[in-house]
């Protein structure tokens, strides 16, 4: 079974968490694209969606799913998003697609965060996947120097601008033993908008697609 087929399995299982008449928060990325496509099959049962990126917004609108601004809605019952890595506490690395800031905001504004992924994303220790850090452009070099002091190797994601008009430093070389602590340390660097660790507020449920079927995992 291919990774893409496993992603589809996880996306299909996530549909079971969608309550009729609600607004669904949607993340960004290849796994979420499968979920959005499936959401289109039940669009008459939901009120609409709040999207974490221009790319997801375009996909939702192409399926005629109403898209709301976060400021126009209250607490969102459910947020569905993928991950680049998850540990067994459902602390995540996200942001490979560059939408980490809006993803983190919508996840925080949601009652339940269901993460969907293929089984390869579950790891014992976070950090093999480079950790994205979104930075204000003028602060990029300064932030990079501070990341080096924390033991990371930041690489400027050239030619990429976030939906917020900022830049990304993909940070290599981190073995992240205390994800929540590092998340706070990085976010305290002046010029950092946010980083791709979702550890202070981890996912509530992890749905993994695997050759054996769907695995549902809750935090340790």
From Swiss-Prot:
Active site: 103
Signal peptide (residue range): none
GO BP, one annotated term: pentose-phosphate shunt, non-oxidative branch
Uppermost EC category: isomerase
Keyword vocabulary terms for this entry: Isomerase
Pathway assigned in UniProt: Carbohydrate degradation; pentose phosphate pathway; D-ribose 5-phosphate from D-ribulose 5-phosphate (non-oxidative stage): step 1/1
GO cellular component: cytosol
Positions that bind substrate: 28-31, 81-84, 94-97, 121
EC number: 5.3.1.6
Molecular function, one GO term: ribose-5-phosphate isomerase activity
Catalytic activity: aldehydo-D-ribose 5-phosphate = D-ribulose 5-phosphate
Superkingdom in the source lineage: Bacteria
Subunit structure comment from the entry: Homodimer.
HAMAP family with a match to the protein in the record: Rib_5P_isom_A
Function: Catalyzes the reversible conversion of ribose-5-phosphate to ribulose 5-phosphate.
Family to which this protein belongs: Belongs to the ribose 5-phosphate isomerase family.
Name of the protein in its database record: Ribose-5-phosphate isomerase A
Classification of source organism: Bacteria, Pseudomonadati, Pseudomonadota, Gammaproteobacteria, Chromatiales
């Amino acid at each position: 079974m291919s990774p893409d087929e496993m992603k589809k399995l996880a996306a299909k299982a996530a549909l079971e968490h969608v309550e009729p008449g609600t607004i669904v928060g949607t993340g960004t990325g290849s796994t979420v694209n499968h979920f959005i496509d499936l959401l289109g099959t039940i669009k008459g049962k939901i009120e609409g969606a709040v999207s974490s990126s221009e790319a997801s917004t375009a996909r939702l609108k192409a399926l005629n799913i109403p898209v709301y601004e976060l400021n126009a809605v209250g607490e969102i019952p459910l947020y569905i998003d993928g991950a680049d890595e998850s540990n067994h506490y459902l602390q995540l690395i996200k942001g490979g697609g560059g939408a980490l800031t809006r993803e983190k905001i919508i996840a925080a504004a949601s009652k339940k965060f269901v993460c969907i992924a293929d089984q390869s994303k579950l790891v014992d220790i976070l950090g093999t996947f480079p950790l994205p850090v979104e930075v204000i452009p003028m602060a990029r070099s300064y932030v990079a120097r501070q990341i080096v002091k924390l033991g990371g190797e930041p690489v400027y994601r050239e030619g990429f601008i976030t939906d917020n008009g900022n830049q990304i430093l993909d940070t290599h070389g981190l073995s992240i033993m205390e994800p929540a602590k590092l998340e706070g340390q990085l976010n305290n660097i002046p010029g950092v908008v946010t980083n791709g660790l979702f550890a202070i507020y981890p996912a509530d449920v992890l749905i993994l697609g695997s050759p054996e079927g769907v695995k549902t995992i809750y935090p340790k």
